[in-house]
Amino acid sequence: MVQEIKIRCKNNKKTLQLPIGSTLWDAYHALNLQMPYGPVSAKVNNKVEGLHYRFYNDKDVEFLDVTSSSGMRTYTRSLFFVLVKAVKDLFPGCVLRIETPVSRGYYCDLRIGRPIEEDDVTAIWRRMREIVDADIPFHRIQSPTEDAIEMFRRQGMTSKVRLLESYGAIYTHYYQLDQTVDYFYGSLLTSTGGLKVFDVMKYYDAVSYTHLTLPTNRE
């Protein structure tokens, strides 16, 4: 007999029974909720979790969409990962740093060994759209931290190495999108298909670098 757990949903005030090990995504579909802008994450006993989260005992759940600040952060992190994959696919060996927020987006420093042209920006947008349209899963992977550190070190991701070394945790969760891996503090969507709204454009600052701005809530 399959063991079941009880989920109490704050969105519609309903309670349901699910097999132990079910995910938040499973619960959302079982509840038949209608969220035009989500869900992108959920509060589980008031702690924000990604939709990959699995239940092993009774929980209170509130699903979140992009109209909440927490939901928008989940959307933005997921979009960042798509951007990372797109520029790596197009410009192997490039350096991308996501910097400070700007109006309705983020200021990104992309170094590809030459000035960025409008055609480059268009190519990035198109590659991101291809990744979104393919609805590729974001896989959440747990591994010993020392293994994750070594993997990021082999890929030259020194900032991730320093970050994980500073935590001192025994195990680490990181994400994989197709063949691209990265570490994010916080949840992502379950797949790229939920990232319907985004844009990429050139952005010039006071020095001679050319950058990108990544709007995350474009009308």
Regions found by a protein language model. Name each.
Residues N11, I112-R114, T216:
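Non-catalytic surface loops within mature trypsin-like serine protease
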Residues M1-F80, V84-K85, F91-V102, R126-R127:
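Ubiquitin-like/PB1-type beta-grasp interaction modules and other compact soluble beta-rich domains
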Residues H211-E219:
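Single conserved hydrophobic/aromatic residue that forms the stacking wall/gate
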Residues Q3, Q17, Q34, Q142, ...:
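Residue-identity detector for glutamine
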Residues Y53-M72, V95-V102, Y107-L212:
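Auxiliary tRNA-acceptor-end handling modules of aminoacyl-tRNA synthetases
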